[in-house]
Amino acid sequence: MAESIKQFTKKFGLPRLIITAFFMLLCVTAVLMGLPFGSMVSDVIRRFGMFGVLVLAMVPAIQSGIGPNFALPLGVLCGLFGGILSMELGFGGGMGFWSSIIISLPFAIVVGWGYGIMLNKIKGSEMLVATYMGFSATAFMCIMWVALPFKHPEMVWPIGKGLRVTVSLDSTFGQILNDFAAFKIGHIKIPTGLLIFFLGSCLVVWLFTRSKMGIAMRAVGDNPKFATASGMNVDNSRIIGTILSTVIGAIGIIVYAQSFGFYQLYMAPQYMAFGAVAAILIGGASARKAKISHVILGVFLFQGMLTVALPVANGLIPEGNLSEVLRVIVQNGIILYALTQVGGGE
């Protein structure tokens, strides 16, 4: 019996098992407390769709061998720059959303390519360098958000220079995916467009991993020495994975922002990677293995737990900030656990 439990725990994953049990406990507690469960389910579904693409950016990074992409802010900043430029050019509605993505792509590709070249020079220290690369890029863009000559009245400060910390998307494409073909089942709102976009993105990435280039990239991530002996270009495959991760991150922040209804600039992107890394690790990924199923399950568990924990924690301890403390503990604890499972000495 003990052996069976041990095998099940090893197969299912200890973090996933703990978070699943805790999430179920939170749901039961919410029902017993009489909280509006329908609205909480709606929030879980919405956050599942809006955060999913950012977590999806981890898949090509892990599969190509660079590990969890803690430099996700690079892609996020490219997406924010593309979105801000789209607003400056006067695009709105569906055109504003798609133009934001299209404009951000060249920046994300160039940044991902340069970052991939850098990672090839510091093999073995990718996660450490990635973290500080994300911090440095965020700080650099704080200067650029002030210095760049944007003039759109909804974006700049009243003095006429420098972008605001929060840029509203109400007049452009805020909620455009959430409202597309949305419907209600009782008190639960289903954001059809948002879910279609996220699941469609998952399908595209899954198809890429089954292509010739994707298989080569996965082979490099699984065993670089074997890939080299087989005649594969390890460095190029790592660069491709980095570019894809950066591009998906740029698209992901645009999806994320339209769901919230605003862009947040300056220091806001700095810690975006940590939640995304924690989510895919909760889903069952490791620092060396990742699949689309890990993304879907991880996003649902991570965002579901955070969404339900907030009203439950406020109901139990109204004076404190227990839900935020819980988020930090789970997010960083999961990342720490995953890093302890990475073998060294190769």
Segments (PLM) and residue ranges:
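Central hydrophobic cores of alpha-helical transmembrane segments
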Residues: 75-79, 130-136, 293-305
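Single transmembrane alpha-helix segments in multi-pass membrane proteins
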Residues: 27, 38-91, 113, 118-124, ...
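Helix-loop-helix "hairpin" substructures at the membrane interface of multi-pass membrane proteins
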Residues: 187-264
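Membrane-interfacial amphipathic/re-entrant helices at transmembrane-helix boundaries
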Residues: 1-56, 93-95
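Transmembrane helix-bundle core of multi-pass membrane transporters
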Residues: 137-209, 318-323
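Alpha-helical transmembrane segments within multi-pass membrane transporters and channels
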Residues: 92-138, 302
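Cytosolic-side transmembrane-helix boundaries in multi-pass membrane proteins
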Residues: 1-26, 222-229, 233-236, 298, ...
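Transmembrane alpha-helical segments in multi-pass inner-membrane proteins
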Residues: 249-251, 259-328
